[in-house]
Every structure is written in C-alpha cells, then in structure tokens.
From Swiss-Prot:
GTP binds at residues 16, 18-21, 32, 35, 38, 119, 122, 150. Residues 182-184 form a propeptide. Changing residue 35 to N: Dominant mutant, which can activate mTORC1 in both GDP- and GTP-bound forms. It comes from Homo sapiens. The modification Phosphoserine is found at residue 130. Alternates between an inactive form bound to GDP and an active form bound to GTP. Inactivated by the TSC-TBC complex via the GTPase activating protein (GAP) domain of TSC2. Autoinhibited by Tyr-35, which constrains the active site conformation, restricting the access of the catalytic Asp-65 to the nucleotide-binding pocket. Specifically inhibited by NR1 (4-bromo-6-(3,4-dichlorophenylthio)-1-(4-(dimethylcarbamoyl)benzyl)-1H-indole-2-carboxylic acid). One of its GO terms (molecular function) is protein serine/threonine kinase activator activity. This is GTP-binding protein Rheb. The gene is RHEB. Ubiquitous. Highest levels observed in skeletal and cardiac muscle.
Amino acid sequence: MPQSKSRKIAILGYRSVGKSSLTIQFVEGQFVDSYDPTIENTFTKLITVNGQEYHLQLVDTAGQDEYSIFPQTYSIDINGYILVYSVTSIKSFEVIKVIHGKLLDMVGKVQIPIMLVGNKKDLHMERVISYEEGKALAESWNAAFLESSAKENQTAVDVFRRIILEAEKMDGAASQGKSSCSVM
C-alpha cells in the first residue's frame, strides 16, 4: 500500500447543527447526546479511501453566525471543508451561505473542496429544509452534498470519505495544471 497521506479538514457551521456530533460519530463511533458548545477541538483518524490510507486531522470549530470573524487558521493548510447545517433550522441554512461566502473571501479562491452536509435528517417531523434545497445549494457552489444523522450514524463515514475524494480531485486538477507547459 502507498505511504499514507495527511489531510486537514475543517468542519464549519452554525451553532448546534451537529458538527461535533458528526465528527465524534466518525472518529469514535458514538453519539454524544448532550450539547456542550465547542470552542475548537482537533481529532485524528486513519481512514482508507480507494486503497490509499489517509491520516486525517479534523478541526471541529466553534459555531459561527453571520457576524463571526473567521480566524486565519481556517485557511492555512486546510485540504477541505465540511459545511454543516441542520435540516431542522432555516437560520442554519441561511448562515451556511454566509459562511461559504466568508470562506471563499478568506481563502481567496473561487473553487475549494467543500462538502455540504444537511445534518439531523432523523428528525423528520421537525424538517424545514428539503433534500432538494440542500442539493441545489451544493450544486450552485459546485460542492458535494449529503444528508446525515450523527445520532443514527447515517452517512457519517461517507461524509469524510467524500471530502477526501473532493480534495484529491482538486489536488489532481491543480497538479495537472502545474505540469502543463507553454512555449511562445
């Protein structure tokens, strides 16, 4: 097997949308039912995707809102971003659009590896954001999209596998662009 690659992923979103729950479900395989606001935590996990082993460093950020100022560290050495909203919260869906815009401004690129995640899909009776709305938003950003339930462990692993694939796809496009040569 090839040497493992290191990738750093930041998880961003509005308060109490399940960023930490999704991350802990992926890393430790358990759901934390209590809400304890995160300042910032970093987790590590080894995962194999398409035969390649990845050493992931996951930056679980504090909840942001439309007035949050992003620390510069959110743009340094980050290989991909998971943007999380709750399918039970219109506010979180609106704020994720603001977060996306601020992220693009901070990183200084139009296209970055992003995975949009609609979390809490197990709360059917409280749903206010449809799957189609989430998918349409992701498509408008040219981002990957999944809905998830950290509580029921639905697609937690898929979310992190997918962001790795998105990051690798962009890395491939970047390295292909670098290898081309023009003589004038």
